[in-house]
């Protein structure tokens, strides 16, 4: 299971982002879950310290803290070099800093219109799911069957015939 960490200092925004993520996980039956909804960078860093798995991070840039979201991403990279970092912020002018700090962000989502933000968050989660499937040899050797309410993955070795 892939863990998702959200760091957003505004409670309303934190709940909006987490609701979009939780709904998409349920609808698509993804092997992901929100591990932490943090309001401070220190809380998130303490949680992931020593964790050696790749995770997903949704980070605000302006965290009203001594550390901004881009500096937080830089600290995350030291612990999780393969993690997926997505910035969700109102500060579009700071997008160039992701290159300066070399954090390799997957996306830079601008807050504002909830419908647009929702589409971009879902697009990020789908993109991550595809990347993980391509990176995992055992997932490549699986048959994916999508029904109305869920997706089932079956190893090709376990399939004898289709009826």
Predicted features, each with a name:
Residues 1-5:
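Non-catalytic signal-transmission and effector/linker regions of two-component phosphorelay proteins
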Residues 8:
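Conserved acidic carboxylate
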Residues 11-18, 95:
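Charged phosphotransfer/docking patches of two-component systems
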Residues 15-19, 33-56:
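Acidic, metal-coordinating helix/loop segments flanking the phosphotransfer/catalytic sites
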Residues 25-31, 80:
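Short helix-capping segments at alpha-helix termini
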Residues 30, 52, 103, 154-157:
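Structured loop/turn residues at beta-strand edges in well-structured enzyme cores
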Residues 54-133:
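CheY-like receiver
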Residues 120-163:
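Conserved binding/recognition cores within well-folded domains
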């Amino acid at each position: 299971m892939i863990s998702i960490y959200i760091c957003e200092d505004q409670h309303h925004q934190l709940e909006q982002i987490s609701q979009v993520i939780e709904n998409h996980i349920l609808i698509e039956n993804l092997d992901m879950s929100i591990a932490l909804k943090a309001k401070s960078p220190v809380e998130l860093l303490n949680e992931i310290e020593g964790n050696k798995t790749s995770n997903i991070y949704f980070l605000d840039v302006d965290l009203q803290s001594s550390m901004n979201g881009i500096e937080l991403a830089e600290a995350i990279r030291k612990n999780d070099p393969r993690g997926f970092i997505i910035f969700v912020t109102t500060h579009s002018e700071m997008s160039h800093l992701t290159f300066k700090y070399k954090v390799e962000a997957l996306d830079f989502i601008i807050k504002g219109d909830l419908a647009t933000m929702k589409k971009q968050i879902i697009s990020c989660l789908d993109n991550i799911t595809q990347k993980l499937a391509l990176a995992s040899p055992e997932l490549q050797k699986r048959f994916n069957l999508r029904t109305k309410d869920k997706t089932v993955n079956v190893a090709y070795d376990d399939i004898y015939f289709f009826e």
